[in-house]
């Protein structure tokens, strides 16, 4: 919501009457009945494991997009991203800390946690957009948006491969996070993995194609359907998860240093909206 307000402020302050019209359209738009423009945001988040994996990995895509806009030659846009990046950092920290505590508790089985990683990480790959995108090409040429690693990257830019380039940087970062989660597993547990970048894709060159989630090898239709049933959460898996959360009090490790929220209920609070 706050991101939208900031973009509306830019439209109103710098784009005259047409900017005000576009800002009004943005503020009036509603995304009921799963009509959000990006498919990932139409997927239900209705349990704690969904919430933690979503905020760790989907909001991480938001960090990547905002960081690319931070290098914008349109200074007001570049400056505005700092506040939004701060907000995304809170989201990612919440998700990553939650997943770590789930892994440390060791109650939710590895195979079930892996299914939710496969679900949300593969969906996040799509958020980087189509391959060979003309929009990404011209956004770079016109200085609206840079590469994620722009200040450190001295290589000649591949203008027709920008989205996929940033998508691979995202996967590298996510792979490091998954490896870190593995360091909190109990001895003997099967390691978690980052899904292959071709798996379960709805956008780009791999859209609608059939690949193994871990190895990336091509599969025929029958083998793929069997594999999807094994590596993405089903209604039965969700029922298992909800039963664990309901009946296992220690399904997540207690947060270290956590305070009872009611103990500070009378204290003045700083709203993130005012940062």
Question: Which residues fall in each region the model found?
Answer:
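Acidic/His metal-coordination segments adjacent to aromatic residues that form catalytic metal sites
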Residues: 27-55, 105-106, 120-139
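Internal, conserved structured core segments that host functional sites
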Residues: 43-94
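A contiguous pocket-lining binding segment that forms or flanks enzyme active sites
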Residues: 76, 80-138
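Domain-scale activation on soluble regions of proteins
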Residues: 10, 35-42, 67-68, 98, ...
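Conserved alpha-helical segments that form or flank metal/cofactor-binding pockets of metalloenzymes
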Residues: 1-29, 96-99
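Polyanion-binding and phosphate-handling cores
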Residues: 68-69, 75-79, 89-105, 153-163, ...
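Extended, helix-rich structural scaffolds rather than catalytic motifs
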Residues: 111-275
